[in-house]
């Protein structure tokens, strides 16, 4: 192994998160040697017991290379992704993982909305929107799974926990949060779907969407849910 590869490998395993991400990008550009180090890193760290940004970034970086041998290896070794798709109600989160792994954020957003309604029950699935009282009863495990998938596959840019952090930083004022995450500009709400940004150039917390036109109570119930303290978000 060359000195440069050795140094980057050490940086990947031992450095700060920021330096890890720099090392991942560099290793991905260094052909089989660098990519082999990334694959080994995945093998040692998956399945994740808790979300780790560097592991998500390695997986997504390798997928984004779109190299047949690597893609085949990832599909064989991680058929359901890198994070346990756990649900307290037996809900299948594999379609969400697949959409996020493919960086198809618009489809992932639609799936998330469907899964949240499924979590709330038949009434919500039929009407296709949520009551805040239904959100309060969501199992923490399911919200943790959904949020972890968004966070891991977006390099930490997307997820309800990201929105919540920005909401807290805004003094819990939704009028300050909406423009910060790109859901409103001045007095004008962002139009769905074309007004939203369905890639990683979007503002932090831009996705997944909530129907804020129905008011803030669903969002507030979600951001106040015990899942965030329970799982250390």
Swiss-Prot record:
Positions of transmembrane segments: none
GO terms, molecular function: tetrapyrrole binding
Gene3D superfamilies tied to this protein: 1.25.40.620, Gun4-like
Pfam family, one: GUN4_N
Protein name: Ycf53-like protein
SUPFAM superfamilies assigned to the protein according to its UniProt record, in alphabetical order: ARM repeat, GUN4-like
Family assignment from sequence similarity: Belongs to the ycf53 family.
């Amino acid at each position: 192994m060359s000195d440069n590869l050795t140094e980057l490998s050490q940086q990947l395993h031992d450095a700060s998160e920021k330096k890890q991400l720099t090392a991942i990008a560099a290793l991905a550009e260094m052909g089989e040697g660098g990519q082999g180090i990334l694959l080994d890193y995945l093998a040692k760290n998956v399945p994740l017991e808790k979300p780790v940004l560097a592991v998500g970034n390695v997986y997504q970086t390798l997928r984004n290379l779109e190299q047949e041998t690597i893609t085949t290896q990832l599909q064989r070794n991680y058929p359901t992704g890198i994070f346990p798709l756990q649900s307290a109600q037996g809900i299948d989160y594999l379609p969400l993982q697949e959409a996020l792994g493919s960086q198809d954020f618009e489809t992932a957003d639609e799936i998330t909305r469907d899964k949240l309604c499924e979590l709330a029950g038949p009434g919500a699935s039929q009407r296709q929107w949520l009551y805040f009282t239904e959100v309060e009863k969501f199992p923490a495990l399911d919200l943790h799974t959904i949020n972890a998938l968004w966070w891991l596959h977006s390099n930490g840019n997307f997820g309800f926990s990201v929105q919540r952090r920005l909401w807290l930083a805004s003094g819990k004022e939704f009028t300050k949060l909406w423009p910060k995450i790109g859901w409103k500009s001045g007095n004008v709400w962002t139009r769905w779907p074309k007004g939203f940004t369905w890639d990683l150039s979007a503002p932090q917390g831009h996705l997944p969407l909530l129907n804020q036109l129905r008011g803030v109570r669903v969002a507030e119930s979600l951001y106040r849910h015990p899942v965030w303290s329970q799982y250390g978000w």
